[in-house]
Amino acid sequence: MATSNLLKNKGSLQFEDKWDFMRPIVLKLLRQESVTKQQWFDLFSDVHAVCLWDDKGPAKIHQALKEDILEFIKQAQARVLSHQDDTALLKAYIVEWRKFFTQCDILPKPFCQLEITLMGKQGSNKKSNVEDSIVRKLMLDTWNESIFSNIKNRLQDSAMKLVHAERLGEAFDSQLVIGVRESYVNLCSNPEDKLQIYRDNFEKAYLDSTERFYRTQAPSYLQQNGVQNYMKYADAKLKEEEKRALRYLETRRECNSVEALMECCVNALVTSFKETILAECQGMIKRNETEKLHLMFSLMDKVPNGIEPMLKDLEEHIISAGLADMVAAAETITTDSEKYVEQLLTLFNRFSKLVKEAFQDDPRFLTARDKAYKAVVNDATIFKLELPLKQKGVGLKTQPESKCPELLAIYCDMLLRKTPLSKKLTSEEIEAKLKEVLLVLKYVQNKDVFMRYHKAHLTRRLILDISADSEIEENMVEWLREVGMPADYVNKLARMFQDIKVSEDLNQAFKEMHKNNKLALPADSVNIKILNAGAWSRSSEKVFVSLPTELEDLIPEVEEFYKKNHSGRKLHWHHLMSNGIITFKNEVGQYDLEVTTFQLAVLFAWNQRPREKISFENLKLATELPDAELRRTLWSLVAFPKLKRQVLLYEPQVNSPKDFTEGTLFSVNQEFSLIKNAKVQKRGKINLIGRLQLTTERMREEENEGIVQLRILRTQEAIIQIMKMRKKISNAQLQTELVEILKNMFLPQKKMIKEQIEWLIEHKYIRRDESDINTFIYMA
């Protein structure tokens, strides 16, 4: 019954019944006059009632609002247009606009029901959006048609003049410019792009006036003040313009006005003078003017391709300055590996400091530093290592390479071996210096050379038991693994330490077994090292030497003991790697001499005839040593650098071991002694092994040939690995991937790559594509 009464009464309430109550409140809101809470609620209620009960009510409300809004705007228009002066016009407009724009957010709120009725919007389903309100749109469209569209150009010009004046240092109310911007942003009637009018007018005018200003100002400032002062000016103006843009331009997310303005400023202030500014870069780098370089970097980083010339200048400086410093110190560093490494580290730290302070460790500049420093480290100008071009000595040609990896290995040896250097350093200091070596090693192209030399030095330290700190030795192996050294190489080093530990247990067992037995030598005086051939990879060359009887008799005992514990394994004796301590007695005193097996064999020739002179020819018969090894060994006993009185004497005198003849006579120096502080010592110990290599001349040649041979094998393996995965690949891509695989060991030369590709084609591992000779196909 109630429902039918409602339907029956629909239409009984008319728009005219309510508008007289609604209109005074609407006019008060337009004029920014205060309304009571009750009036505010009544307006909501009356709008709702008219929209609900009068079918034509919504349209009538809309029309009535339009008339009142238009009337209000005409009054505002009259107040604005009463000013003829553009600045006065702008100020008057902004006063009226700000009041009106505020009411654009307030007046639409009571008319929500009007929105629902006219537009079909459901307030219950969608959040009310004042910006989409038809009342707000009505207000803004009417303002645009009545006032803004007629005077917008005058307003815009006035706003731009104010911005220009601000650039020249004059102050004004920033709201005058902001109000013009707001008008453009909010008075656009295009629903698809609400910023269209703003972009086409205000933003364009702002950007054009900015560009005109700096196209005039910048060249004259540069001419009057020079490049370095101009950079400060440009930097200050860019920061100033960014702050100004954030005030005067639209900053909503979908608008990129600020970015467009900054691009415009960069073009006018920096890009136009790019070449002039960059011309100063090289000199600044040479003079280490980091603050100025940082300023240049911050400017050029805003310009397309602005950084590239700076990177090139940095690279050229590092290479030229680095090599110049190395050449200047060549006399010292070529003979002193410690000074060499210190020099390289000094250069690295100097260039790193430059990159940090001037370029804030920007990755592009770090890459340029690394590239240039790598060129310095791998330069072969000052000193070089000659490697044979072909394997197994086909031809005598050699290829020069940087001696850096060899010198790094020597320096590591000085730190890891018992030397004056390692003795004066703490464990922490040794570790720090080794880490510095690893830093330089990162830039070495041919790491395989370092590996070879490092392993040779490690072999010597382990065999002679002259490591300064066994814990650091083993840590070094792991550090090499961490810096990306090939796993097979690092694993062999680890196996070497394992062999030494196993040998210690074997020695203990051997001594236990023979503690009550009578051997040629007491078991306690013998230290046996059983080494794995694969890990230690010693030369296949066997150097025969006639051992003293005591040693000859001991060897079968050791072999028998080992076979009992490890059946099926065969021992190969490497006398070249062996050493011992012998006691030397004469009229002066008694001394312990640390000697190689070869030195021992030579000295034992006098054991039964201590005062005789023995010729070179007879010593060769007695020791059965090869000629070259005998000469080298004798020279170490007649011209040992650390001794003032040598162990052996000889006649006639010669300048080098090569000058010994068959008739050169050698004898034991009966006055041999150790001299300390100008006093003869009656007892003492001296190491005669010194830097005498535990390798033969031929073995050293094999080491270098082995490096080349291993490179060839590694190159072949890598090509096969790539071809298996790719199946088909171009020559250029193959070379790129090959370098990537091998870079942690060595940098393969194009000639070597070409030769190995041809070898693999010849042996049917790969073939050329019939349609393209520069493409290779894998043959399973």
UniProtKB/Swiss-Prot annotation:
Which is a Gene Ontology cellular component entry for this protein? site of DNA damage
GO MF terms held by the record: ubiquitin ligase complex scaffold activity; ubiquitin protein ligase binding
PROSITE patterns, alphabetized: CULLIN_1, CULLIN_2
In this chain the Cullin neddylation domain maps to 711-772
Q: Which residues carry this modification: Phosphothreonine?
A: 210
Which keywords fit this entry according to its UniProt record?
Isopeptide bond, Nucleus, Phosphoprotein, Ubl conjugation, Ubl conjugation pathway
Q: Which SUPFAM superfamilies match?
A: Cullin homology domain (SSF75632), Cullin repeat-like (SSF74788), Winged helix' DNA-binding domain (SSF46785)
Q: Which domain of life is it from?
A: Eukaryota
Q: How is it modified after translation?
A: Neddylated; which enhances the ubiquitination activity of ECS complexes and prevents binding of the inhibitor CAND1. Deneddylated via its interaction with the COP9 signalosome (CSN).
Q: What InterPro entries does this protein's entry cite?
A: Cullin, Cullin_CS, Cullin_homology, Cullin_homology_sf, Cullin_N, Cullin_neddylation_domain, Cullin_repeat-like_dom_sf, WH-like_DNA-bd_sf
Q: Where are the residues linked by the Glycyl lysine isopeptide (Lys-Gly) (interchain with G-Cter in NEDD8) cross-link?
A: 724
Which residues are reported to carry the modification Phosphoserine? 34
Protein location = Nucleus
Question: Could you provide one GO biological process annotation from this protein's UniProt record?
Answer: regulation of neuron migration
Q: Indicate the quaternary assembly.
A: Component of multiple cullin-5-RING E3 ubiquitin-protein ligase complexes (ECS complexes, also named CRL5 complexes) formed of CUL5, Elongin BC (ELOB and ELOC), RNF7/RBX2 and a variable SOCS box domain-containing protein as substrate-specific recognition component. CUL5-containing ECS complexes specifically contain RNF7/RBX2, and not RBX1, as catalytic subunit. Component of the ECS(ASB2) complex with the substrate recognition component ASB2. Component of the ECS(ASB6) complex with the substrate recognition component ASB6.
The function of this protein is: Core component of multiple cullin-5-RING E3 ubiquitin-protein ligase complexes (ECS complexes, also named CRL5 complexes), which mediate the ubiquitination and subsequent proteasomal degradation of target proteins. Acts a scaffold protein that contributes to catalysis through positioning of the substrate and the ubiquitin-conjugating enzyme. The functional specificity of the E3 ubiquitin-protein ligase complex depends on the variable SOCS box-containing substrate recognition component.
Its protein name is Cullin-5
Give the organism, scientific name.
Answer: Pongo abelii (Sumatran orangutan)
